Regions:
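A short, N-terminal "cap"/entry segment at the start of jelly-roll beta-barrel domains
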Residues: 1-27, 107-108
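Conserved short histidine dyad/triad with adjacent acidic residue
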Residues: 31-45
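Glycine- and acidic-residue-biased ligand/ion/polar-headgroup-sensing regions
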Residues: 49, 53-59, 64
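A cytosolic small-molecule/anion-sensing beta-strand core signal
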Residues: 55-56, 71, 90
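Structural motif
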Residues: 58-60, 67, 83, 93
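Short acidic-glycine-tyrosine-enriched beta hairpin
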Residues: 65-80
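Ligand-binding loop in jelly-roll beta-barrel domains
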Residues: 80-104
Length: 109
């Protein structure tokens, strides 16, 4: 499977958060995120593991009550069911991989 950036729909979650669903394999799915400076993904948890890579900008991540600052080129791993949030530091772009496949797609019911 191939994904061509121009042909993938961008979904606007509001408050400066956009994402593209890049697709899924047998055991994982992948998202591309764009976040405006200062935009927030509020505290939440999910049963999937989450691995991410910061392409541009950065995040302040709160993970289980501790805060971490990540910048361009940094990666992160969030264990299943861990309480976490993101605040974009500057215009931020990132890739997230979820395993097993994340069934709840942001912005869909």
């Amino acid at each position: 499977m191939f994904c061509y950036h121009e042909s993938i729909e961008k979904k606007d979650l509001g408050k400066g958060v956009l994402f593209q669903y890049l697709g899924k394999g047998q055991n994982m799915n992948v998202f591309h995120w764009n976040m405006a400076a200062g935009s927030v993904v509020a505290l939440h948890r999910h049963p999937e593991e989450q691995f991410g890579y910061v392409i541009k900008g950065g995040f302040e991540i709160e993970l289980e009550g501790k805060k971490y600052t990540l910048k361009e080129g940094d990666a992160y791993f969030i264990p299943p069911d861990a309480l976490h949030s993101f605040v974009a530091i500057g215009e931020t772009e990132a890739i997230d991989v979820f395993a097993p496949i994340k069934k709840e797609i942001p912005g869909e019911k």
